[in-house]
Amino acid sequence: TFKVTLNTPTGQSVIDVEDDEYILDAAEEAGLSLPYSCRAGACSSCAGKVTAGEVDQSDESFLDDDQMDEGYVLTCIAYPTSDLTIDTHQEEALI
């Protein structure tokens, strides 16, 4: 289990996420309302930016290598591989 800190427009939340659980799903289970659309890694609605830690988002098909290198993540298909911090609601930054 990893500690995932989510920095949202309304404040900060820390949730526990299993290494085989998508970050978006865990956030919803914790009662948080994060943006999403396709839930398949094919759009940018759920995009966040990792500011600390690592994720596995090998199922994504939307972000390019430069965006991933900059830390962008699709929370609907991202698994934590360490404790991490994500700034949520980053779709506008990608467009």
UniProtKB/Swiss-Prot annotation:
Cofactor: [2Fe-2S] cluster
Main localization of the protein described in the UniProt heading: plastid
Keyword tRNA-binding: no
Keyword Magnesium: no
UniProt cofactor note: Binds 1 [2Fe-2S] cluster.
PANTHER family assigned to the protein according to its UniProt record, in alphabetical order: FERREDOXIN, FERREDOXIN-2, CHLOROPLASTIC
Protein name in UniProt: Ferredoxin
Source organism of the structure: Marchantia polymorpha
Lineage, top ranks: Eukaryota, Viridiplantae, Streptophyta, Embryophyta, Marchantiophyta
